[in-house]
């Protein structure tokens, strides 16, 4: 009954298994892909008929991680998986981006890809496995798909490229790059790097593409054995007469409209032309399909913009191919934030803030690969007003999560180490205007805001979006693309980095035939653009401010004897809780005795440090301290001498004469000098007021052990 078909092959240091025909036989196609115990089950379902009036391709990619894959039960209240995490959303996008361009134009049948992680080896990230599974399932399904694709992760360790590095190897790597493509062409790159050169990044892309050919070959072999018949799908025949009629009415007018440099004005004019053209044609023949007319008009728009670029004419906004739009850079624009910047590039604008917090503010991520703490948070918000529209405002959408992660990757390489700058840092980018590459504007704004906040970043970083228009062997690479150029072009190519190298690279290619040489031209052109933007940014602020904001918490660090940690924490946390409440500070203690005190007020921090030093102070026998009477008993009085330590003054040690009644000499709360006579094995302290008053030396406060103290 069950007849599994299996293919095994070696992929770098891992063994990959593709299995189909065993499960989910009612899906259009299903594949179980495993790579060294990390297994992802991928299904594809395609509808044989498109919905009437459907004018876009409804492809959905869902990626879901099951905690049973790692032998765990979810920690949520309901003890089951809920909405997708940020990590799951990012991997769903990673799968979607290289497969979407491979469906034929005009194909609008609904297709859903579901990738479920069912087993995980902590050393093998499921994302590459899921991408291979999606490629295999689509290739097996018979759905019109111009694949398969391969996928590879590339690391860079000891000046060598490493194929599909393990999680441990990635910690040593200067690069984390994912590349996907067909046999002939690269389609997608997603990466972060420790400021590598253009040549090193391009080498990694080429290396990954070469290595993934084994995946493509094995998927093709599996399809020969188990593939379903290819769907008999044909695109709608082109109505040449209608195309010519629409072009006659609209092409010249659209060509003129695309010389309007202001985005909103241009959009308004284009909308008028489209509406009037459609109205004219429907008046001539009411049986015409309005959606079809819209598609023809869109194709004319695309052709107008592309042909003008290829002919060497100025772009939509009048720029040459390698020109950057006008820049406006401002820092310190919000008075009470810890750091802020307003970065404007043409009609794209980002208001970016940086906020400093303590280690307690770090985000704890409960991931399938294990729990980790993130001390650098980057959030990107894209409100509808940024493009002059109305819309829903709420939790971030897939696009916002993806753009935020890309911008974070651009900045991560220059962030200081926690031991040098022990703060959790949150950057928020509010896109206030958008016309192309708001994610790269967020990188520039983040660099400025972090410097304004006094975060000692290693270098300033900037980002730029590149585009490509290609027809045959003729191509033009565009710097700093507009939204329209992104939409109508063949490649979206985003590069972020410093003067020294690249920190993030993202490529999405919509056509085949992008060669290594074209990518080289784009990278070199992007470098020139990046250096130009950095030059303008450096005029506004060229180094991190010498001090953090007065409104940011200052972290003071002292070192105590690890044996004394229990004294500072107290029973059930009572001492540290009282300390934080009474001093108005935040206190964190590490196992090695490092104590971090965070406060916006320096005096509060000093008070907390003094009290911690008192608690951890060693009591010195023979020394005189100032104490306070805390309890009176028949045989003497208990006196607190600081740091939560209390000793007994026996009735015989109160005065140099016989004392009948303790209360004749001492009252509750009275401050008295006391001399330490003895500290016994159990830590009990014997004190004397009599001997303290006889001594001429002044009373002392408890002395703290030598401490490393810094800010």
Swiss-Prot record:
Gene3D superfamilies in the record: GHMP Kinase, N-terminal domain, K Homology domain, type 1, Nucleic acid-binding proteins
Binding sites annotated in the UniProt record for Mg(2+): 486, 492
Encoding gene, per UniProt annotation: pnp
EC class: transferase
Major localization listed first in the record, in broad terms: cytoplasm
Region of interest (Disordered), ranges: 689-711
GO annotation terms (biological process): mRNA catabolic process; RNA processing
SMART domains: KH, S1
GO cellular component: cytosol
Keywords: Cytoplasm, Magnesium, Metal-binding, Nucleotidyltransferase, RNA-binding, Transferase
EC assignment: 2.7.7.8
SUPFAM superfamilies: Eukaryotic type KH-domain (KH-domain type I), Nucleic acid-binding proteins, Polynucleotide phosphorylase/guanosine pentaphosphate synthase (PNPase/GPSI), domain 3, Ribonuclease PH domain 2-like, Ribosomal protein S5 domain 2-like
Name of the protein: Polyribonucleotide nucleotidyltransferase
Domain KH stretches: 553-612
Compositional bias ranges of the Low complexity kind: 694-711
Required co-factors: Mg(2+)
Subunit structure, as described in the record: Component of the RNA degradosome, which is a multiprotein complex involved in RNA processing and mRNA degradation.
Function per UniProt: Involved in mRNA degradation. Catalyzes the phosphorolysis of single-stranded polyribonucleotides processively in the 3'- to 5'-direction.
Keyword Iron listed: no
Location within or outside the cell: Cytoplasm
MF (Gene Ontology): 3'-5'-RNA exonuclease activity; magnesium ion binding; polyribonucleotide nucleotidyltransferase activity; RNA binding
Superkingdom of source: Bacteria
Protein family according to the UniProt entry: Belongs to the polyribonucleotide nucleotidyltransferase family.
Catalytic function, reaction form: RNA(n+1) + phosphate = RNA(n) + a ribonucleoside 5'-diphosphate
Domain S1 motif: 622-690
Keyword set includes Thylakoid: no
């Amino acid at each position: 009954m069950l007849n599994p078909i299996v293919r095994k092959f070696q992929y770098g240091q891992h063994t990959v298994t593709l299995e189909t025909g065993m499960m989910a036989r009612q899906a259009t196609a299903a594949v179980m892909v495993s790579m060294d115990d990390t297994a992802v089950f991928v299904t594809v379902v395609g509808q044989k008929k498109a919905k009437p009036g459907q004018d876009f391709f409804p492809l959905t990619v869902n990626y879901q991680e099951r905690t049973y894959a790692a032998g765990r039960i979810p920690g949520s209240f309901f003890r089951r998986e809920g909405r997708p995490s940020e990590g799951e959303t990012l991997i769903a996008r990673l799968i979607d981006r290289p497969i979407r361009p491979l469906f034929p134009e005009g194909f609008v049948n609904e297709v859903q890809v579901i990738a479920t992680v069912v087993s995980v080896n902590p050393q093998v990230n499921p994302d590459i496995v899921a991408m291979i599974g999606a490629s295999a399932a689509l290739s097996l399904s018979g759905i019109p798909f111009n694949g398969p694709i391969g996928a590879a992760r590339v690391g860079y360790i000891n000046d060598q490229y490493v194929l599909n590095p393990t999680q441990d190897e990635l910690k040593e790597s200067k690069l984390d790059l994912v590349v996907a493509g067909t046999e002939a062409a690269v389609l997608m790159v997603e990466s972060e790097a420790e400021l590598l050169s253009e040549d090193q990044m391009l080498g990694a892309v080429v290396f990954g593409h070469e290595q993934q050919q084994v995946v493509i070959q094995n998927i093709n072999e599996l399809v020969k054995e188990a593939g379903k018949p290819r769907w008999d799908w044909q695109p709608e025949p082109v109505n040449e007469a209608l195309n010519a009629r629409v072009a006659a009415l609209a092409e010249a007018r659209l060509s003129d409209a695309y010389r309007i440099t202001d985005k909103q004005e241009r959009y308004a004019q284009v909308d008028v032309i489209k509406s009037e053209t459609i109205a004219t044609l429907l008046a001539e023949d009411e049986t015409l399909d309005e959606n079809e007319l819209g598609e023809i008009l869109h194709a004319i728009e695309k052709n107008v913009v592309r042909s003008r670029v290829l002919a060497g004419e100025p772009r939509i906004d009048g720029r040459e191919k390698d020109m950057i739009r006008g820049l406006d850079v401002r820092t310190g624009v919000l008075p009470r934030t810890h750091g802020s910047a307003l970065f404007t590039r043409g009609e794209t604008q980002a208001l970016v803030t940086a906020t400093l917090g303590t280690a307690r503010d770090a985000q704890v991520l409960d991931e399938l690969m294990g729990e980790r703490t993130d001390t650098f948070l980057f959030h990107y918000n894209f409100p509808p007003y940024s493009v002059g529209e109305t819309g829903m405002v709420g939790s971030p959408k897939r696009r916002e999560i993806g753009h935020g992660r890309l911008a974070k990757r651009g900045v991560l390489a220059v962030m200081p180490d926690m031991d040098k700058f022990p703060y959790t840092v949150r950057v928020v980018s509010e896109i206030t205007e958008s016309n192309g590459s708001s994610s790269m504007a967020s990188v520039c704004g983040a660099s400025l805001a972090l410097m304004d906040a006094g975060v000692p970043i290693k270098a300033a970083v900037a980002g730029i979006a590149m585009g490509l228009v290609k027809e045959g062997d003729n191509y033009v690479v565009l710097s700093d693309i507009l939204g329209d150029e992104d939409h109508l072009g063949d490649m979206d190519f985003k590069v972020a980095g410093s003067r020294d190298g690249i920190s993030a690279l993202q490529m999405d290619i919509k056509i085949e035939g992008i060669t290594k040489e074209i990518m080289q031209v784009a990278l070199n052109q992007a470098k020139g653009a990046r250096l130009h933007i950095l030059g303008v940014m450096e005029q506004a602020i060229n180094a991190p401010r010498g001090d953090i904001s007065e409104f940011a918490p200052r972290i003071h660090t002292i070192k105590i004897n690890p044996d004394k940690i229990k004294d500072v924490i107290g029973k059930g946390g009572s001492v540290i809780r009282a300390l934080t409440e009474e001093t108005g500070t935040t206190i964190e203690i590490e196992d090695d005795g490092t104590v971090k005190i965070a406060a916006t007020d320096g005096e509060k921090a000093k008070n907390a440090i003094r009290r911690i030093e008192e608690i951890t102070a060693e009591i010195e026998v023979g020394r005189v301290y100032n104490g306070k009477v805390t309890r009176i008993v028949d045989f003497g009085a208990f006196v607190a001498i600081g740091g939560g330590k209390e000793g007994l003054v026996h009735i015989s040690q109160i005065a140099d004469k016989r004392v009948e009644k303790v209360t004749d000499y001492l009252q509750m709360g009275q401050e008295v000098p006391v001399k330490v006579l003895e500290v016994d094995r159990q830590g009990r302290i014997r004190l004397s007021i009599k001997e303290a008053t006889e001594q001429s030396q002044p009373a002392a406060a408890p002395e703290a052990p030598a401490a490393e103290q810094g800010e």
